[in-house]
Amino acid sequence: MKKTLLCWLAALGAAAVIPACGGAAGDKSLSGLDRERFRSEVNGRPTDLYTLTNAAGMEVCITNFGGRIVSVMVPDRTGTLRDVVLGFDNIADYVRIPSDFGASIGRYANRIGHGRFVLDGDTVRLPVNNYGHCLHGGPDGWQYRVYEAHQPDPQSLALTLHSPDGDAGFPGAVTAKVVYRLTEDNAIDITYEATADRPTVVNLTNHSYFNLSGDPTHPILDNLLTIAADGYTPVDSTFLTLGRIDSVGGTPFDFRRPKAIGAEIDSDDEQLRNGHGYDHNWVLATAGDLSRPAARLVSPVSGIALEVFTDEPGIQVYVGNFLDGTVRGKHGIPYAHRTAVCLETQHYPDSPNKPQWPSVV
């Protein structure tokens, strides 16, 4: 079992909480999402939009297509609710436009080098989809699957996916369960479980794109980021980890104290060139410890803060380096360069080929 907590810290208890865009009417969410635009079928399986709410007025919308978080409405310093994640406002765009917006990633999050690894003496070969590597489970990863959904109460949603033996090249049949729970203290509790009928590799994460300003046109370079990590795993020019852990000390990768994401992102640094900015795995000092945050993100514009708690050993930080304005998201807004940051809790990239790192078998 893997657990991640996304804890939102903002000005609660305001006299009024007013949506920043649109409002709930009929089957519309506070973020302006129309549930009917998510009710469809993909590969013969029904899709829908599910809404979680709490007494504090926070709202989270999730679709069972890819197990994706579609919107998160959280109050800013004035008490105004703002949507702080990127995504689409209809199922057709999620199907038509390849993306990881808000997705539950599997069977293996991040990269497996050259699309192959050895398990129990057998070489497993996977389809490659990113610079000759298998990224996020390949071109038919779980972010493009329809999960079975069960909503037992207004604050939780359970999503289940059955992946057969040989699915996308991976050995063993796997049943995965993702449970989203919205707490009364404005935390999204994400729990992952996976069971397999034979040895295989599994690495699950959530791929939400956060923009805590609540304005998806506003770059995230002014966001203050803190990461509880003394080391990170450097990559080559194809984004594949080099198999070692380097110290963050004296480098642009040192976020042990709060620092603006943009403070050093344009530094003359080989790793920043290789990643086109930050797109790296940090080695968490909090591994296995849910009592202290692994990362913290604060928007000076909205005052909204996000704390990430996880029992995973790593976190991939990606700052929207490849967003270029060609994709239009919710409300027709184009998503431009570096207008979001992803905080993907995980095991280290390419772990199946790195026996020195925590096992994913």
What are these regions (language model features)?
Residues L9-P19:
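Bacterial N-terminal signal peptides
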